[in-house]
Amino acid sequence: MEFSVRAAELTTLLESRITNFYTNFQVDEIGRVVSVGDGIARVYGLNEIQAGELVEFASGVKGIALNLENENVGIVVFGSDTSIKEGDLVKRTGSIVDVPAGKAMLGRVVDALGVPIDGRGALSDHERRRVEVKAPGIIERKSVHEPMQTGLKAVDSLVPIGRGQRELIIGDRQTGKTAIAIDTILNQKQMNSRATSESETLYCVYVAIGQKRSTVAQLVQILSEANALEYSILVAATASDPAPLQFLAPYSGCAMGEYFRDNGMHALIIYDDLSKQAVAYRQMSLLLRRPPGREAFPGDVFYLHSRLLERAAKRSDQTGAGSLTALPVIETQAGDVSAYIPTNVISITDGQICLETELFYRGIRPAINVGLSVSRVGSAAQLKAMKQVCGSLKLELAQYREVAAFAQFGSDLDAATQALLNRGARLTEVLKQPQYAPLPIEKQILVIYAAVNGFCDRMPLDKIAQYERDILSTIKQELLQSLKGGLTGERKIEPDAFLKEKALSLI
């Protein structure tokens, strides 16, 4: 049997086949592992790779390209390198490292790549942001002018912090650095409850770098019990995580905080602590065969921290008026603030809160050294009433410290010196505060006003804490709120009478 095929039919058939033929090309640039060890893989063949690009190994482990050399690419591995062998294929992803950001992150605990580790499932609606971005320029910024209350009397009165500021918390191990940071997060609970709009709310990001997992779990428990997780994000790169993740975690947390800053909201980010990030970066740099410098840190360790902390800023009204406040933590060795990393970060930040072991063991907690602690821009953001009340506080404490050193040797002191010692001891007592008990600003104003104006001068030192509790529990709410307006002229009459009456009962 013969089949006759007409040319027109054949043409139509071929045309329809060609029209419906889709080819979906996917071009992958593939490299091969030349050597691997100590969390570093040398890869040959990735000629077009970008610095900081994410790559994927055949085993599924990811890494980031940091060294682009003539012969090969130095890649730091996010995870265990035991599953990577010489000759394995490595694929470019084409994307620079990014993390999820947005309000969906609030209340969650994530790792340095933004993957949830709290066992509460995947993240809901969110956007993705690059971890490394340029800091806002000069024109996009505005001077710091809004207060960021920590709830700690010693900080809010003597070293006030403003929204958009970078204030370093520095001290030896076990001096209460993390306690100040946590108290600041807890204090935002009452501040946010008073907020009338989204622009007044302050969201918190806590980045734990190189800490024990048990410590991070304890922190999560403290925040959840205080209902503070609802406005907080926790980024954890624990001690058991690879060095690249500890290096990356602060940038990831910063990208999450920048979401709020760039959308007209306010955020606070705590880096606890940047000493461990510098150590992780030193480890990576030495393994990548980069030349070491002072204390074996690489030459760009200053840039490591400056590019991170410059991203904390107060935005101008034209760019949304949002802010990102940074509280970096640095651990010193035996109180040496002149070491390499501490001096670097002190020079980058807008002030520092210095904590001392000696004060901590003497029971002065928070153990803030008032003489060394400073806030370079915060006073512009301090409440007017607080500024009036604590104007003489720093001077009196400085004079007290000076005289107290000599008073140990001589017993025959004149009346003025004895009065100064007496007042200084009481001011020091008033600035003490238990952990996880932040005070609203109006209560701080009342307590400091009482101490500065001599209501505690004739009172035994052990009665001062009781006096503080008494006045805070019995003062009328209207009178307390009126303190924010300042304590001058006629406004002083009612508080003075109230404080005097309470003081007389304890003398």
UniProtKB/Swiss-Prot annotation:
Q: Which organism is it from?
A: Pisum sativum
As for family, the record states: Belongs to the ATPase alpha/beta chains family.
State the HAMAP family in the record.
Answer: ATP_synth_alpha_bact (MF_01346)
The compartments listed are: Mitochondrion; Mitochondrion inner membrane
Annotated function: Mitochondrial membrane ATP synthase (F(1)F(0) ATP synthase or Complex V) produces ATP from ADP in the presence of a proton gradient across the membrane which is generated by electron transport complexes of the respiratory chain. F-type ATPases consist of two structural domains, F(1) - containing the extramembraneous catalytic core, and F(0) - containing the membrane proton channel, linked together by a central stalk and a peripheral stalk. During catalysis, ATP synthesis in the catalytic domain of F(1) is coupled via a rotary mechanism of the central stalk subunits to proton translocation.
| Record's protein name | ATP synthase subunit alpha, mitochondrial
UniProt keyword list:
ATP synthesis, ATP-binding, CF(1), Hydrogen ion transport, Ion transport, Membrane, Mitochondrion, Mitochondrion inner membrane, Nucleotide-binding, Transport
Gene name of this polypeptide:
ATPA
State the NCBIfam families in the record. atpA (TIGR00962), PRK13343.1 (NF009884)
Q: Name one GO cellular component term.
A: proton-transporting ATP synthase complex
Q: Where is this protein primarily located?
A: mitochondrion
Site residues by UniProt (Required for activity): 373
| Subunit field text | F-type ATPases have 2 components, CF(1) - the catalytic core - and CF(0) - the membrane proton channel. CF(1) has five subunits: alpha(3), beta(3), gamma(1), delta(1), epsilon(1). CF(0) has three main subunits: a, b and c.
